[in-house]
Swiss-Prot record:
Subcellular location: Cell inner membrane
Function: Catalyzes the initial step of the lipid cycle reactions in the biosynthesis of the cell wall peptidoglycan: transfers peptidoglycan precursor phospho-MurNAc-pentapeptide from UDP-MurNAc-pentapeptide onto the lipid carrier undecaprenyl phosphate, yielding undecaprenyl-pyrophosphoryl-MurNAc-pentapeptide, known as lipid I.
Ranges annotated as spanning the membrane: 13-33, 49-69, 95-115, 119-139, 154-174, 183-203, 215-235, 237-257, 281-301, 347-367
Annotated protein name in UniProt: Phospho-N-acetylmuramoyl-pentapeptide-transferase
Keywords from the UniProt entry: Cell cycle, Cell division, Cell inner membrane, Cell membrane, Cell shape, Cell wall biogenesis/degradation, Magnesium, Membrane, Metal-binding, Peptidoglycan synthesis, Transferase, Transmembrane, Transmembrane helix
GO biological process, one term: regulation of cell shape
Enzyme superclass (EC): transferase
Pfam families named among the record's database cross-references: Glycos_transf_4, MraY_sig1
EC number: 2.7.8.13
GO molecular function: metal ion binding; phospho-N-acetylmuramoyl-pentapeptide-transferase activity; UDP-N-acetylmuramoyl-L-alanyl-D-glutamyl-meso-2,6-diaminopimelyl-D-alanyl-D-alanine:undecaprenyl-phosphate transferase activity
Reported cofactor(s): Mg(2+)
InterPro entries per record: Glycosyl_transferase_4, PNAcMuramoyl-5peptid_Trfase, PNAcMuramoyl-5peptid_Trfase_CS
């Protein structure tokens, strides 16, 4: 008898199984990378210890904070025009970023002995988290999907990005305005043009991770993979920022204990904007923009899918004011859901892609 293969066949894994597999995989990766670099994995300046400590601390913090968020009635407002399977998520607490982001920041600061660059990146991370919190709070207060206006959100992102760039301008070496190309012994000098690019990267990366946060465990897992790889790449030149990346990666893993399918809490803009800001800030500080571009492949594709959807809709708009859609729904992960993929299939596939991108980055990195 002929049988039609559905997108969900062949995937027999639970949300907790997927999250556990990711945590185990990143733990083994951290140990391996420390071993390759001749680092003691159980010292503060490593990948393994910050990853492990912040995973545990974030997971434990969630058991206290998630019930509090439930009691405060911070339930997520679900879009009615989205995938119908998401309607059952209505009421799930959001703002999860308020516990796992601070856990990572505190852990990184302590383990790095409050290194200046870690304090700077932490300040940018918390600033973007604050923007997200304001947006999340407005959504909850108004009981709709509309938070602060896009213009206000963008203005705040630009302001904090400008402040970080000013600090970078006066506290980092002059060659920071040259972009290192890892596969050739050459740096692309940008001069003053570096600064508008830096501001753009901070804003774009935070919004890209924000768009990726649409399925249980998706943003948390893919960012955890990117952060650990970025930490390994920057380790030779900035051990303190390696610790920061490992701590934030671990905190994402701890958050997945509560955000894996079916999620008990969402990170909200509080978490997603902070994560994107952190990735961009570390890359700018360590001249790792090429690595960031590769590691952020999933986030950029998600963003491009939204841009393509909007552009195509406007270009095909007829006299009735309605246009055609390129995708069933943007971002891409929602299109895949509406095409018959399960949430777990989308998330596991994106984890695999994120891992491949991380391996590519590590392969070309000048260790």
């Amino acid at each position: 008898m002929d049988a039609k293969l559905s997108p969900n066949q062949g995937l027999n894994i639970s949300g907790i199984g997927l999250a556990s597999s990711l945590a185990a995989g990143l733990g083994i990766a951290a140990l391996t990378l420390d071993w390759i670099a001749n680092r003691n994995p159980w010292q503060g300046t490593s990948l393994t210890l910050p990853l492990l400590l912040c995973t545990i601390a974030s997971a434990i913090a969630g058991y206290f904070v998630v019930p509090l968020l439930q009691a405060l009635k911070t339930g997520q407002i679900i879009r009615e025009d989205g995938p119908q399977a998401h309607l059952k998520k209505a009421g799930t607490p959001t703002m999860g970023g308020i516990f796992f982001i601070p856990v990572a920041v505190v852990g990184a600061c302590v383990l790095s002995n409050f290194a200046t660059e870690v304090l700077a990146v932490s300040a940018l991370t918390l600033s973007y988290g604050l923007i997200g919190w304001i947006d999340d709070w407005q959504i909850l207060r108004r009981k709709s999907n509309k938070g602060i206006s896009p213009r206000m959100k963008l203005a705040l992102q630009i302001c904090f990005a400008a402040a970080f760039c000013l600090w970078l301008m006066f506290n980092q070496p002059a060659n920071i305005t040259s972009i290192a190309l890892p596969w050739v012994s050459f740096a692309l000098p940008l001069g003053f043009l570096f600064w508008p690019l830096a501001g753009f990267v901070l804003v774009a990366e935070s919004n890209a991770t924000n768009l990726t946060d649409g399925i249980d465990g998706l943003a948390g897992g893919t960012v955890a993979i990117a952060l650990l790889a970025l930490g390994a790449i920057v380790a030779p030149t900035s051990p303190a920022l390696m610790v920061f990346c490992a701590a934030l990666s671990g905190s994402c893993l701890g958050f997945l204990a509560h955000n894996r399918n079916p999620a008990r809490v969402f990170m909200g803009d509080t978490g997603s904007l902070a994560l994107g800001g952190a990735l961009a800030a570390v890359a700018l500080l360590t001249n790792s923009l090429v690595a960031l571009f590769i590691l952020s492949g999933i986030f950029f594709v998600e963003t491009l899918s939204v841009m393509a959807q909007v552009s195509y809709y406007k270009a095909t708009k007829g006299p009735d004011g309605k246009g055609k859609r390129l995708l069933k729904m943007a971002p891409l992960h929602h299109h895949l859901e509406l095409s018959g993929w399960s949430e777990l299939q989308v998330v596991s596939s994106f984890y695999v892609i994120a891992t491949i991108l991380a391996v590519i980055c590590l392969a070309i990195a000048p260790f």
